[in-house]
Amino acid sequence: MSSPSIAPVTPDLVRLRATARDKDDAIAQAAQLLVAAGCVAPGYDASMRRREGLANTFLGHGLAIPHGVGEDRHLVRRDGIAVLQLPEGVEWNPGQTTRLVVGIAAQSDTHITLLRRLTRLIQDPAQLEALFTTDDPAVIVAALTGDRAPDTSAAPATDLAERFEWTIAYPSGLHARPATRWAETARGFSARAQVRAGDQAADAKSLVGLLQLGLRAGDSITVSAKGSDAPALLKRLRAVMDSLTAQEKADAERAAQRRAAPVIGWTPPQAQPAIVGIGASPGVAIGIVHRLRAAQTEVADQPIGLGDGGVLLHDALTRTRQQLAAIQDDTQRRLGASDAAIFKAQAELLNDTDLITRTCQLMVEGHGVAWSWHQAVEQIASGLAALGNPVLAGRAADLRDVGRRVLAQLDPAAAGAGLTDLPEQPCILLAGDLSPSDTANLDTDCVLGLATAQGGPTSHTAILSRTLGLPALVAAGGQLLDIEDGVTAIIDGSSGRLYINPSELDLDAARTHIAEQQAIREREAAQRALPAETTDGHHIDIGANVNLPEQVAMALTQGAEGVGLMRTEFLFLERGSTPTEDEQYQTYLAMARALDGRPLIVRALDIGGDKQVAHLELPHEENPFLGVRGARLLLRRPDLLEPQLRALYRAAKDGARLSIMFPMITSVPELISLREICARIRAELDAPELPIGIMIEVPAAAAQADVLARHADFFSIGTNDLTQYVLAIDRQNPELAAEADSLHPAVLRMIRSTIDGARKHDRWVGVCGGLAGDPFGASLLAGLGVQELSMTPNDIPAVKARLRGRALSALQQLAEQALQCETAEQVRALEAQREGQA
């Protein structure tokens, strides 16, 4: 491969002995040099400043590389580099002084070669100091455009005995996920293996080494090997490299479609750079951003004997691998293989020979093991971040994260920050992901909104965000975590966008929108006790999804007419042991008494798939969503099912008005078996008969609704799981989550099929999934024939208001239109059409 050419830098684009008042002035001067040379159009400096809000362009060691955002590439007329020498320096960020500003204008990513060269310059302090003070612009030009960095001791890489040529066909280049597969494959053989790009080569078994090549789509590489099994290694590695291409292209296409999708709801009057994710909880909020990350800890250099240090490092690496394996296994159980792969890639970093070698070299020089490890991690991570590729910047974050895990084993004082380390000013919280318990514990006085790099819109974190009333977006990708703390942003949880550094005009528009929405919510809240009755007199029952007795009062205050879903798994999830029959009985009775005679539907334990409980000692499954969960688990674990049923029937005997609902029913025999167990326990306790219903969550149940209705007293549709199974999409997969849309016509047709089957036996149908809590979704469901809707309490006023403002005949017409649509986007467009006609 021939190395990509450096963007042109000539003496007229170098300004020596300049001074700047501040960072903005330095950026303006660099941009002016580019404008004068015809490289960019006027206004490019604004794009460079917007980039500063998205990422820190300070490389360290006195170097900064301001450049524009990708959306403004139309301002670049030709590639160019402008250099502003500032001998006296200027503060780039607090505590960071820049003495050489390298302004970049590039229509593509050809400047990665320049960034690689700059990282080498950083490793030569004497050469770098000369650039800060030279009076000759040719010296700077030579340093930036020479074939190699000043260090000439290293010879160009040569290939090994066996080889093949390959062109990178991954649209995002070689990032961590495919690089991990490459390294894993190569390590399965004894032969030495190498990947060469131009005059640079990396050990094919080293993840970090592969990433440091900075390979982009279209780059040509030579893969070579030497050893007894070299031919087999190369054959297998090439097969793996080829097999990843289709998935990488599909992922890139989905990401492009998401970015290009029209914005539904509020839009800023001025075009602003936005991080695009998936809307998870509606609402708009304005605030500074705060990135949740581990604390930056000073690591003390405490030298010890090399032998003792080696033992400490080995033990720390072993414990960290065990920790990551446990996290990976837990994530696989709860969220699926896609999210678990994150921790697999992190564990792969611990096998990197460059990282271990660099640590050992520092220890040999007499440094302490913790200090040496920290320095090695930072050196390599800084090199990855400096390549200017946002994908590789994300891998630098991964390396630092796993590095901190090892550091915590070596030095417990280096533990990271948590949710308690929030700024005094209310903020929009950014995180890789949050567990449901973390989300539930958020202080809504301190957190205005939530954005995560991972996750899906039907995840439990998203559901809890809606419960808390926090605007939230998920699946925004690694770029979210590159945003600097303290930057002002607008989060729109409806469209799934985070607008960075908005203008005053945009801020004013957002404030107006927030005030208007607040006024609407106040009107809805004032009428929340009114029934959900359409303008032509049709009544829809409204229930709340509630987990604990103490939550009932708030649900009733919001307008709930009962509890349409009590998730009993939360009695098992939030403790270290299985609740006893008596403990469950007390909870169910307390729930019923809090409802004071209003209906209560209790779902039997729904564990498995995305919900796992360590103390239940469930077996590991490769695909838990298609494994032993819901009713399948209950029938296999009478030690869990029967105490729960006894507790429920005891509560009913003592006056509780309740119904029992079984999850994940897939067949008639399952339902009959469960009914027989209920009948036996009821007879043993001499308890009253209770209505027994089932969840419709899988296509098999929807398709057999007419048959199941012979044996069930009612149906409740779980739209979150039904969507996942109908569309064959893991709802936690950030790459696919945008497509897991409950408004997909295929899902709506399954709901209609369920209703038609239930009507044959005069059974009522409810919905307790996320679609019920969306006013537009609730309108569709009512039009399809759903008789009861159960939702997060905070959603009740808006849903009731929407239903009261429509005629059933209009909702039925809307539902018929939706069933004829081809995509979820077409269904959503019906809402805009209806609102426009209203």
Curated annotation (Swiss-Prot):
<dbReference type="GO" id="GO:0046872">
    <property type="term" value="F:metal ion binding"/>
</dbReference>
<feature type="active site" description="Pros-phosphohistidine intermediate; for HPr activity">
    <location>
        <position position="175"/>
    </location>
</feature>
<dbReference type="InterPro" id="IPR001020">
    <property type="entry name" value="PTS_HPr_His_P_site"/>
</dbReference>
<keyword id="KW-0479">Metal-binding</keyword>
<comment type="similarity">
    <text>Belongs to the PEP-utilizing enzyme family.</text>
</comment>
<dbReference type="InterPro" id="IPR050499">
    <property type="entry name" value="PEP-utilizing_PTS_enzyme"/>
</dbReference>
<feature type="active site" description="Proton donor">
    <location>
        <position position="768"/>
    </location>
</feature>
<dbReference type="InterPro" id="IPR023151">
    <property type="entry name" value="PEP_util_CS"/>
</dbReference>
<dbReference type="Pfam" id="PF05524">
    <property type="entry name" value="PEP-utilisers_N"/>
</dbReference>
<comment type="function">
    <text>The phosphoenolpyruvate-dependent sugar phosphotransferase system (sugar PTS), a major carbohydrate active transport system, catalyzes the phosphorylation of incoming sugar substrates concomitantly with their translocation across the cell membrane. The enzyme II FruAB PTS system is involved in fructose transport.</text>
</comment>
<keyword id="KW-0963">Cytoplasm</keyword>
<dbReference type="InterPro" id="IPR008279">
    <property type="entry name" value="PEP-util_enz_mobile_dom"/>
</dbReference>
<dbReference type="InterPro" id="IPR002114">
    <property type="entry name" value="PTS_HPr_Ser_P_site"/>
</dbReference>
<dbReference type="GO" id="GO:0005737">
    <property type="term" value="C:cytoplasm"/>
</dbReference>
<dbReference type="Pfam" id="PF00381">
    <property type="entry name" value="PTS-HPr"/>
</dbReference>
<feature type="modified residue" description="Phosphohistidine; by HPr">
    <location>
        <position position="67"/>
    </location>
</feature>
<feature type="binding site">
    <location>
        <position position="731"/>
    </location>
    <ligand>
        <name>phosphoenolpyruvate</name>
    </ligand>
</feature>
<keyword id="KW-0597">Phosphoprotein</keyword>
<dbReference type="InterPro" id="IPR000121">
    <property type="entry name" value="PEP_util_C"/>
</dbReference>
<dbReference type="InterPro" id="IPR040442">
    <property type="entry name" value="Pyrv_kinase-like_dom_sf"/>
</dbReference>
<dbReference type="GO" id="GO:0008965">
    <property type="term" value="F:phosphoenolpyruvate-protein phosphotransferase activity"/>
</dbReference>
<feature type="binding site">
    <location>
        <begin position="720"/>
        <end position="721"/>
    </location>
    <ligand>
        <name>phosphoenolpyruvate</name>
    </ligand>
</feature>
<dbReference type="InterPro" id="IPR018274">
    <property type="entry name" value="PEP_util_AS"/>
</dbReference>
<dbReference type="InterPro" id="IPR015813">
    <property type="entry name" value="Pyrv/PenolPyrv_kinase-like_dom"/>
</dbReference>
<feature type="binding site">
    <location>
        <position position="567"/>
    </location>
    <ligand>
        <name>phosphoenolpyruvate</name>
    </ligand>
</feature>
<keyword id="KW-0762">Sugar transport</keyword>
<dbReference type="GO" id="GO:0016301">
    <property type="term" value="F:kinase activity"/>
</dbReference>
<dbReference type="Pfam" id="PF00359">
    <property type="entry name" value="PTS_EIIA_2"/>
</dbReference>
<feature type="domain" description="HPr">
    <location>
        <begin position="161"/>
        <end position="253"/>
    </location>
</feature>
<dbReference type="InterPro" id="IPR000032">
    <property type="entry name" value="HPr-like"/>
</dbReference>
<keyword id="KW-0460">Magnesium</keyword>
<keyword id="KW-0418">Kinase</keyword>
<keyword id="KW-0598">Phosphotransferase system</keyword>
<protein>
    <recommendedName>
        <fullName>Multiphosphoryl transfer protein</fullName>
        <ecNumber>2.7.3.9</ecNumber>
    </recommendedName>
</protein>
<feature type="binding site">
    <location>
        <position position="603"/>
    </location>
    <ligand>
        <name>phosphoenolpyruvate</name>
    </ligand>
</feature>
<feature type="modified residue" description="Phosphohistidine; by autocatalysis">
    <location>
        <position position="460"/>
    </location>
</feature>
<dbReference type="GO" id="GO:0009401">
    <property type="term" value="P:phosphoenolpyruvate-dependent sugar phosphotransferase system"/>
</dbReference>
<dbReference type="GO" id="GO:0015764">
    <property type="term" value="P:N-acetylglucosamine transport"/>
</dbReference>
<dbReference type="Pfam" id="PF02896">
    <property type="entry name" value="PEP-utilizers_C"/>
</dbReference>
<dbReference type="InterPro" id="IPR006318">
    <property type="entry name" value="PTS_EI-like"/>
</dbReference>
<feature type="modified residue" description="Phosphohistidine; by EI">
    <location>
        <position position="175"/>
    </location>
</feature>
<feature type="binding site">
    <location>
        <position position="697"/>
    </location>
    <ligand>
        <name>Mg(2+)</name>
    </ligand>
</feature>
